[in-house]
Amino acid sequence: MVRMEDIISLAKRKGFVFQSSEVYGGLSGVWDYGPLGIELKENIKREWWKSMVYLHENIVGLDSAIFMRSEIWKASGHIDGFSDSMVDCKDCKSRFRADFVDLSKNCPNCKVGNNFTSPRNFNLMFKTHIGVVEDSSSEIYLRPETAQGIFVNFRNVLDSSRLKIPFGIAQVGKAFRNEIVAKNFIFRTCEFEQMEMQFFVHPKQIDEWFCYWQQNRMNFFIETLKIRPDRLRLKAHNSTELAHYAKSAFDIEYEFPFGFQEIEGIHNRGNYDLTQHSKFSNNSKVFEYHDLLTKERYVPYVIETSAGLTRSVLMTLCDAYSEEELSDGDKRIVLRLHPKLAPYKIAIFPLVKKVELVEVARRIYVELCDDFHIFYDDSGTIGKRYRRQDEIGTPYCVTVDYNTIEDETVTVRERNNMTQKRIFINDLYSYIKTEILNYKEDVNK
């Protein structure tokens, strides 16, 4: 099992993730995504969007605002009920979520004793004001979830897209939670991104579609992101774990170095949200569906799939990370990412920094950069350049050498098994495209 400290070291060293405000001492629970991190994050997001919107004719996209009227959060139950229970250790002053510690045992931080304060609720929403006057009428919140932006746009999307039940609305966006304890690197943070889809169905079809989306979402991680199946599991919520809006729920969990944790939730939200907004807005018809064939009018039930994008980045790094002992006794760190997720698809090297080789390498870069994200490197030994690309997950390295000048061929080196092939420059585009399309995950990953 990979160690968390190895993932954090790689992420910071190679430019996947940086501590926010680091030059000022850092800000707990907040992270910046570097040049490689943003590429990996965008690639995961792109695959999710494709799997949701492009592969389902009855699912469309939305990008709702972060700021919304506070009445929305009153209706959804977040103002009154979106809180965690917290306790403080009286000896070391550390703060914990009450459900994360055994109050009958010693403090996990100072180990002195179980001298905890009584549990008290802590609302997780960030409150601010909009406009020039700071009073109760101008109170506004940073959204703690993206779902409510979908629900209040139910009628807008339904009418403008000419959709019929069942249909879904997908959204990727930032959410904010004032976590009592932000921990485990980018797993639990105050600012994060969600990939959510709300699927609206007839109440009598809720069980059928609930089962469908459980399987569909598990398949996404296994078949699309190529996450190892033995590190994934589907876990049902018991009645005490259900959110205030959920009738039933399942989590897809991944086995991180710190144990199995949720990466996506599939929830049967019933008609809770649409009914609440119907009541609080005094506009019931907006949240009602009229079936023109059966003449039936009803408030749809909702199945939610809610995945953490930033958690998915951490999962992908953990799942792809490997260390190998080579025959010469050296150690090789490899990120065995699927090529479609890799920040760079190709690295191009002139064997040595000679004008005639650099010119050809630059020409290849220009010819391919419109179709592939490419890293160009002409410094250091070829072996060190290979190792640098292995560490960041680049699947293919193209080397221009003196034979290239004679026969217009280059060496293509594959990341996982380090095999090399001579390929004509004119065939590079089709070769790389075919390799990515037919990529098989490494069984030794």
From Swiss-Prot:
InterPro entries, A to Z: aa-tRNA-synt_IIb, aa-tRNA-synth_II, aa-tRNA-synth_II/BPL/LPL, Anticodon-bd, Anticodon-bd_dom_sf, Gly-tRNA_synthase/POLG2, Gly_tRNA_ligase_bac, GlyRS-like_core
Pfam families: HGTP_anticodon (PF03129), tRNA-synt_2b (PF00587)
Chief location: cytoplasm
Gene Ontology MF, one: glycine-tRNA ligase activity
Binding site for substrate: 97, 145, 192-196, 304-308
Entry keyword annotation includes Membrane: no
Residue positions binding ATP: 177-179, 187-192, 262-263, 308-311
CDD domains (alphabetical): GlyRS-like_core (cd00774), GlyRS_anticodon (cd00858)
Keyword Nucleotide-binding applies: yes
GO-annotated cellular components: cytoplasm
Enzyme class: ligase
Protein purpose: Catalyzes the attachment of glycine to tRNA(Gly).
Family, similarity comment: Belongs to the class-II aminoacyl-tRNA synthetase family.
Protein's UniProt name: Glycine--tRNA ligase
